[in-house]
């Protein structure tokens, strides 16, 4: 099994007026928690994981002034859509790090607002992805995981196999050529992560269990799809609305100023 650290793509573009209005920043990724920009929390989590290698960020040149960018190999200017951003980032990683070779390790994709990730969560997750040995790996977190962690469980869940799950902020794709025709569907799954009916409609497996969903997605994408259940509540959390931002400021520790 290849043990080379994964190349990481962080999608950090876009604005969120409900979060940034009155803060003096235009972009969500620059919004601070304990005086540290959200993107810096995310870069820190990946930078300090032995399973993560090169980090590529997609976002505007406003991000260049952030201290964490010294640990980013390349910033790619955001395009007009998530699909375009992904294609630009994947194209860069394939050309720069994989030298255009068809056989490579694939791509880890995350987001500039996944501030609840830690190096430990990233390491466990990327090791699980490595062991899954699949073309596409998705993670979900069960509702009970939030309860046991003492975190608010009032979020949107997807009913699967008699339990309730929510999506996460780390995805793996081995080869985008295999999923290019269905890339819009994958993006739609991310977009619909807060809407159980919406994501089940995209998946097309309402009421089924995870093995059935894996089989359906594998057949649809002509790729080996694995769905893993993460034991980490932080995997199922991001900063998408003001309540998330308040929670982040409440539970995230004040960072060590020398951490990065």
Segments the model singles out, each with a brief description of its role:
Residues 226-229, 238:
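Conserved active-site beta-strand element of glycosyltransferases/polysaccharide synthases
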Residues 17-48:
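Short, well-formed alpha-helical segments that are part of the catalytic scaffolds
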Residues 241:
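Short, conserved phosphate/pyrophosphate- and ester-handling motifs at nucleotide-, phospho-/glycolipid
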Residues 3-7, 36-105:
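Conserved N-terminal catalytic core of the sugar/cofactor nucleotidyltransferase
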Residues 118-219, 230-233:
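Conserved core of the sugar-phosphate nucleotidyltransferase
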Residues 106-110:
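Short aromatic-hydrophobic micro-motifs that form the base-stacking/packing surface
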